[in-house]
């Protein structure tokens, strides 16, 4: 079982106190971060590159397989043209530029469609900022579009990406949007508006205006995540928020004046939901400037397609297969599976409606389905044996990696899935589990098996992929995931990975970074 790995991050930060105009402070910070850069640590930049490459693999796979939302939004983008005087944005796999906001929406939707890119849980224990809001690195297309428009090179573009991840990551540590039924992508929209406006040369007034417009006009609610079966709106939420963030940035640069001092506005979402005295917002906001003092070091990788709060249960299964080698080959002998998890995971992925998913969007957010599919995949691997086991004797993350085919209509309807789900009980682990989130993903799995008796995983907190897990093992699996996702979509997965790494790339390289062919995808 992976153990916690402690990593110290050092570097300078900037504090924006609650009793200041934090929107203007963010604007100053964004401009300074891009225009007066301090050295960023090699570990931070390397991690950022890996998260970006991983996101590209997710996006390319979704488009190559004709996933609905990104295909619809890409088609819409390809029907648009850049505004007069604009260089436009490039959609994945296209050969001509489109309207910036449309291209950003299409690319962000593709990146997010599989729900397999990087994840953060808003946690900085050292500073006592543990709001635990979710977030994902869905917004890199904003940085690419701004870079193309502004003529930035690869190293400058990486800073725009890091700026977006830093702002949304630090907001996630101090303000839990989910507690007020607001979708987590809103933090990314605020970050995107600030970073885009700054990258395009906006002054402090314009950047503050863009932030104010996003907060005042474009707040997405978690209605997109309610109901028995999830829709395209769930997967495209970040894309639509990125679209309006870019529009707000460009509109502000054109002279539109949005609300000022929005974080202390008594009727904006922050003080409206967390009342506090006039002249204050509900939180201090501290942002990294240099070294490795960035929120990205608390971001996690997904080692396949699954809602990330399932990762602890998946690691528990991998541990049980290693501990009881006969288990993988005999899921039919399972009499009961009990999974103990924490809040908010219990409410999100153990919702009773998730026991009978009929769409991929619901299945990949269904803990029972994810576990059932993994058990069936383990049996197939164990039965095949030999070369099917990558150097081991029992199936591990390599063999059990959940991919798009694991969520197709045939597998969702597999009677074996329903049979296993019928044996599962998902319970709330109680205060002991809740207290360990968001530092970890506390989960335990207990299996009652006809042949092997009672099998207990013990408490899993840091599954592979988690920021505090074994990073070397995680990196190997992330690279493997990329290769598997883009296989069949491009001629040479390794060449694609090299192409989209940004360090040292020229302005011309960055402008055409996503303009590579994708098999089966309209080049426009």
Which functions belong to the PLM regions below?
Residues 2-132, 233-243, 250-524:
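Terminal-appendage/accessory-domain detector
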Residues 47-51, 138, 156, 160, ...:
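Residue-level detector of well-ordered alpha-helical segments, enriched
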Residues 49-50, 127-140, 149-158, 183, ...:
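Conserved, well-structured ligand/cofactor-binding cores
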Residues 59-62, 142-150, 193-199, 248-251, ...:
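Well-ordered alpha-helical scaffold segments within catalytic/enzyme domains
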Residues 85-88, 144, 151-152:
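Carboxylate/His-rich catalytic cores and anion/metal-binding grooves
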Residues 136-144, 188-195, 242-247, 310-314, ...:
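Well-ordered alpha-helical segments within folded domains of soluble proteins
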Residues 140, 166, 216-220, 288-292, ...:
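Short connector loops/turns at beta-strand edges and beta->alpha or beta->beta junctions
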Residues 147-243, 247, 261, 266:
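Glycine-rich, mobile lid/loop segments that gate access to catalytic sites or pores
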């Amino acid at each position: 079982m992976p153990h916690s790995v402690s990593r110290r991050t050092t570097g300078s930060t900037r504090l924006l106190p609650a009793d200041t105009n934090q929107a203007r402070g963010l604007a100053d910070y964004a401009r300074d971060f891009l225009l007066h850069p301090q050295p960023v640590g090699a570990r931070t930049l390397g991690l950022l590159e890996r998260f970006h490459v991983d996101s590209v693999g997710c996006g390319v796979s979704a488009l190559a397989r004709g996933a609905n939302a990104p295909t619809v939004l890409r088609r819409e983008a390809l029907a648009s043209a850049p505004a007069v005087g604009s260089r436009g944005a490039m959609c994945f796999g296209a050969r001509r530029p489109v309207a910036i906001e449309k291209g950003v929406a299409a690319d962000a939707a593709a990146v997010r469609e599989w729900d397999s890119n990087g994840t953060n849980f808003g946690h900085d224990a050292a500073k006592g900022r543990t709001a635990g809001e979710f977030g994902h690195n869905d917004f890199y297309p904003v940085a690419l579009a701004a870079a193309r428009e502004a003529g930035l090179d690869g190293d400058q573009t990486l800073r725009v990406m890091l700026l977006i991840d830093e702002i949304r990551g630090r907001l996630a540590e101090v303000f839990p949007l989910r507690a007020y039924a607001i979708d987590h992508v809103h933090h990314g929209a605020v970050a995107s508006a600030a970073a885009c406006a700054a990258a395009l040369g906006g002054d402090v007034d314009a950047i503050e205006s863009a932030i104010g417009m996003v907060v005042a006009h474009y707040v997405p609610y978690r209605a997109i995540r309610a109901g028995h079966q999830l829709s395209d709106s769930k997967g495209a939420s970040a894309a639509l928020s990125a679209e309006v963030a870019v529009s707000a940035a460009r509109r502000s640069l054109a002279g539109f004046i949005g609300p000022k001092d929005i974080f202390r506005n008594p009727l904006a979402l922050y003080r409206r939901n967390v009342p506090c005295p006039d002249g204050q917002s509900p939180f201090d906001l501290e942002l990294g400037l240099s070294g490795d003092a960035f929120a990205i070091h608390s971001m996690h990788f997904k080692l396949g397609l699954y809602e990330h709060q399932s990762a602890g249960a998946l690691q528990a299964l991998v541990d049980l297969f290693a501990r009881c080698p006969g288990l993988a080959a005999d899921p039919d002998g399972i009499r009961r599976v009990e999974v103990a998890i924490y809040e908010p995971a219990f409410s999100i992925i153990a919702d009773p409606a998730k026991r009978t998913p009929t769409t991929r969007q619901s299945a990949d957010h269904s803990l029972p389905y994810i576990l059932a599919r993994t058990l069936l995949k383990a049996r197939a691997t164990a039965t095949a044996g030999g070369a099917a086991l990558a150097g081991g004797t029992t199936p591990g993350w390599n063999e059990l990696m959940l991919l798009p085919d694991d969520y197709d209509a045939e597998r969702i309807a597999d009677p074996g899935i329903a049979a296993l789900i019928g044996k599962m009980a998902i319970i709330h682990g109680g205060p002991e589990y809740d207290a360990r989130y968001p530092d970890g993903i506390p989960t335990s799995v207990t299996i009652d098996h006809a042949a092997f008796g009672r099998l207990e995983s013990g408490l899993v907190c840091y599954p592979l992929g988690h920021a505090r897990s074994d990073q070397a093992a995680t990196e190997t699996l992330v690279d493997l995931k990329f290769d598997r996702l883009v296989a069949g979509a491009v001629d040479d997965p390794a060449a694609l990975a090299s192409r989209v790494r940004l360090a040292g790339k020229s302005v011309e390289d960055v402008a055409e970074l996503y303009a590579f062919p994708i098999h089966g995808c309209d080049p426009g």
